[in-house]
């Protein structure tokens, strides 16, 4: 069968399900594909097709993730669901599947549980910008309380909702403005809709995704940034730096900054080449060579970035969320302690840094995730949300994300 052509007529938004084990993330994922395919076209994916998530390797870390897609009237959604808690931790920290927004699934019969809290914290740390809540298993709660019209049901729902809004506030998400939809993913998956808890609730959830999660800014519309991979000097022409444009556009004649490792310097782009052809501009996703005026071969090095002036700044100290590879993943066999000084691999280069563990944490075991403050020996062009690998002698032992810049 011929591959279907991917239609680019709708904006593309990346989402995913998060929440405590057995609260119904995978059931809701399957229900979303079923309801959307029936109402707005596309293909439904069965629960088993999502639950048997294939393992992927991202930066040497094994992560089990399921990817499904569905359409709303105005958008195309790519949705990621993970089978186990550890997979969520790894996925969110490595940015293997970056989310423009998350669907927090919480069982209304249980209310918020430890992983509910942990996934909200992780979303904050790794920069998931928006959360929409689905209060699942509303049919079971209604059964326990004597029906959806009973006072007890209304009180219980209100209580769980209040707890969730407070929890979101704790981690600096706007609890009061967050859309919360109650329903039953299982009913929706089975095509039932008693008391509008099934299909209708899932439709309401999709409407909330459409209205509450803004369309993400495309990489090409963001300020120009290109990590420097290599530097050449071409006699009579000057210095050329090569790399893959991470975001934005660089045009011939534009002023640029060289940021990181040393003091920030200014330069001008006098040419862009790709495959030995001269271009007027280089765009996000392209591998290009940028010719720089007045910049000497020794003024630039791998690990720096070329960027739009003022758009990114160099820093050395930051708070991060880290996942430490387990022994089975080829990581360390032993824990590390405070004073640990590995290399931090940002974009194209390693920089040594010292780790400060949170209060009360004596050591970090392989397979753990932990918040820590890192101080690098050289500044790196950095923003919150930037991903990095932790290495020892060229071997990856962890992955992390910049949660907050300190200095």
Curated annotation (Swiss-Prot):
InterPro entries: EF-Tu_GTP-bd (IPR041709), EF-Tu_GTPase (IPR050055), EFTu-like_2 (IPR004161), EFTU_2 (IPR033720), G_TR_CS (IPR031157), P-loop_NTPase (IPR027417), Small_GTP-bd (IPR005225), T_Tr_GTP-bd_dom (IPR000795). CDD domains: EF_Tu, EFTU_II, EFTU_III. Monomer. GTP hydrolase that promotes the GTP-dependent binding of aminoacyl-tRNA to the A-site of ribosomes during protein biosynthesis. Residues 184-186 are annotated as: G5. Its EC number is 3.6.5.3. The keyword Kinase does not apply. Residues 19-26 are annotated as: G1. Pfam families: GTP_EFTU, GTP_EFTU_D2, GTP_EFTU_D3. This is Elongation factor Tu. Its main location: cytoplasm. Residues 10-217 form the tr-type G domain. It is found in: Cytoplasm. Mg(2+) binds at residue 26. Residues 136-139 are annotated as: G4. It catalyses: GTP + H2O = GDP + phosphate + H(+). NCBIfam families: EF-Tu, PRK00049.1, PRK12735.1, PRK12736.1, small_GTP. Keywords: Cytoplasm, Elongation factor, GTP-binding, Hydrolase, Magnesium, Metal-binding, Nucleotide-binding, Protein biosynthesis. Belongs to the TRAFAC class translation factor GTPase superfamily. Classic translation factor GTPase family. EF-Tu/EF-1A subfamily. GO terms for cellular component: cytosol. Residues 60-64 are annotated as: G2. It comes from the Bacteria. GTP binds at residues 19-26, 81-85, 136-139. Residues 81-84 are annotated as: G3.
